């Protein structure tokens, strides 16, 4: 089972709102997910990103791969740096 951390589109037409979810890569984008670990709202002026850092690191240590967009969001929040430091044992 290839697990990915990716965005699940919510909200109404022309007003997207995303949940950051852990899902099997075979499931559809807006389909079933294993766990919701955060939210992303691109419509607010300072973009709103809320991520459960502990759950994200747990899933990444278990082998979940973030999508490109989620990887950028995690980098902006400083989670990718913490993940790499933990992986290298710093």
From Swiss-Prot:
Pfam families per the record? Ribosomal_S16
Q: List the disulfide bonds.
A: none
Q: Tell me a GO cellular component.
A: cytoplasm
Query: What top-level branch of life does the organism fall under?
Result: Bacteria
Record keywords: Ribonucleoprotein, Ribosomal protein
The record ties this protein, via Gene3D superfamilies, to: 3.30.1320.10
GO molecular function terms noted in the UniProt entry: structural constituent of ribosome
Among InterPro entries, the record links this protein to: Ribosomal_bS16 (IPR000307), Ribosomal_bS16_dom_sf (IPR023803)
The Gene Ontology biological process annotation of the record reads: translation
Which family does the record assign?
Belongs to the bacterial ribosomal protein bS16 family.
The protein's name in its UniProt record: Small ribosomal subunit protein bS16
Coding gene? rpsP
């Amino acid at each position: 089972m290839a697990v990915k951390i990716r965005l699940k589109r919510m909200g109404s037409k022309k007003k997207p709102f995303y949940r950051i979810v852990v899902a099997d890569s075979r499931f559809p984008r807006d389909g079933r997910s294993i766990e919701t670990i955060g939210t992303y709202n691109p419509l607010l002026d300072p973009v709103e990103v809320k991520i459960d850092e502990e759950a994200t690191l747990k899933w990444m240590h278990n082998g979940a791969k973030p999508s490109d967009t989620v990887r950028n969001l995690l980098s902006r929040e400083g989670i990718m740096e913490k993940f790499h430091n933990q992986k290298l044992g710093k």
